[in-house]
Regions:
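Membrane-proximal alpha-helical signals and transmembrane carboxylates
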Residues: 2-8, 14-399
């Protein structure tokens, strides 16, 4: 009996210990936090941004070494280029902590489906990293820029993307799963945020870029990249990108500016925005109604408007709604006529509204979308005016 117990114990221990057979020590890995993919002629050029743990540790005094290092490699396929990187890196690149993938603009113009295959297929890549596109720069040039405040440039790109999406609305964070799902929908176009290098790209790689009060080279998000199928076809301006975010119910907060009745301007802070898209068919003809409800506070007043009066608040509400409405309508028209791709999910709304009617038109959606009737309704409510009601320019009348 005792012998049987020992055998059972050994079997249990064998099962427990087998879990460590594939372990890899931290000092044996090169932790990749950002991956750049460019297309040079018929080859892929891969850039990996690898963290130096000793340089970002709070316990260790700062040295003159960079907190990250970039390695570059070329290959006929991305898989080959990554493996060839072991000839220059002291450790094998490890992608389980990847935070962001930067797609080069030239690659995006050719098509991104092939480039995404490995990172979607390989088990080592987690599926929660964001995907962005470089604009007027290669992915390599973007990942070579050292950034102030955030020691790791990948963190800077990720944090700026998140903060801008929440406070301004001209960017959207799109992870790899969301992008692949959109690319798989032949009736919908994809959108990803575009980033560019401001300043001399050659200076961005130097440590002095983070040692000056006025940083000479910066990474800046510049709008949304529009894809038709898997190909990049154009860039939306900051204003157009915000309009798309309103339509896609992505606005969490932003700023609106209106002209005052006499002269000067007034700024408001959007605190909440809710968008509902309704599709319908009339005599077989599709139509989209967009209802946007906005709540805001007065943020800055540079005119003599009297905010204690209801008619002034009504004026602010009306002008804000009018401004949002006009920008959205112009953006929709541009996307319909210039890009001819449904980045709003209007096709999905029509499918939900009437599956039978949608089935009749879905194969012709590409030709129907440019002439689709889209009606936008914007309602704005102003809830507060901050810690003071009127501007210092609004002087009370003498009695």
């Amino acid at each position: 009996m005792a012998k049987l117990n020992w055998i059972c114990l050994l079997c249990i221990l064998t099962l427990l210990l087998s879990g460590c057979w594939s372990k890899r020590e931290l000092n044996e890995l090169a932790i990749v936090v950002a991956l750049g993919i460019d297309k040079i002629d018929d080859e892929y050029e891969i850039t990996v941004q690898i963290v130096d743990p000793s340089e970002i540790s709070m316990r260790q005094a700062s040295t003159q070494r960079s907190p990250v290092v970039s390695y570059h490699s070329r290959g006929e396929t991305i898989f080959e280029a990554i493996r060839k990187m072991t000839t220059i890196a002291a450790r094998k690149p490890y992608f389980a902590h990847l935070q962001v993938v930067v797609l080069g603009e030239d690659l995006a113009k050719e098509g991104i489906s092939d480039a995404l295959d490995l990172i979607v297929r390989d088990h080592e890549f987690r599926k929660d990293f964001d995907v962005i596109m470089s604009h007027e720069a290669t992915a390599k040039e973007v990942l070579n820029v050292l950034t102030p405040i955030e020691k790791v440039p990948a963190n800077k790109m990720l944090n700026s993307l998140d903060v801008s999406e929440k406070a301004w609305g001209s960017t959207i964070a799109v992870n790899i799963d969301e992008l692949v799902n959109t690319l798989s929908n032949k009736h919908k176009g994809a959108l990803i945020s575009a980033i560019e290098v401001h300043g001399d790209k050659k200076l961005g790689v130097d440590q002095t870029n983070v040692q000056r009060v006025k940083t000479p080279v910066l990474l800046r998000y510049t709008g949304l990249a529009v894809f038709k199928g898997d190909k990049y076809i154009g860039l939306l301006t900051e204003s157009e990108s915000k309009s798309v975010s309103f339509l896609n119910d992505k606005i969490q907060s932003t700023i609106e500016i209106i002209a005052c009745p006499n002269k000067g301007t007034l700024s408001t802070e959007i605190t909440q925005s809710t968008t509902k898209v309704k599709g319908s068919f009339k005599n077989g003809k599709p139509k989209i109604d967009v209802h946007i409800n906005v709540e805001q506070n007065v943020g800055e007043v540079e005119c003599d408007i009297d905010l204690t009066k209801n008619k002034s608040i009504d004026y602010v509400n009306k002008k804000t709604a009018q401004g949002i409405d006009e920008r959205i309508e112009k953006t929709v028209e541009k996307i319909q006529q210039q890009y001819e791709v449904d980045v709003f999910g209007f096709g999905d709304a029509l499918h939900r509204a009437d599956p039978k009617q949608w089935k009749k038109i879905k194969d012709d959606w590409t030709s129907i979308f440019p002439d689709l009737a889209v009606v936008v309704h914007v309602k704005v409510t102003t809830q507060g005016s901050g810690t003071m009601q009127n501007s210092l320019l609004n002087k009370p009348k003498e009695e």
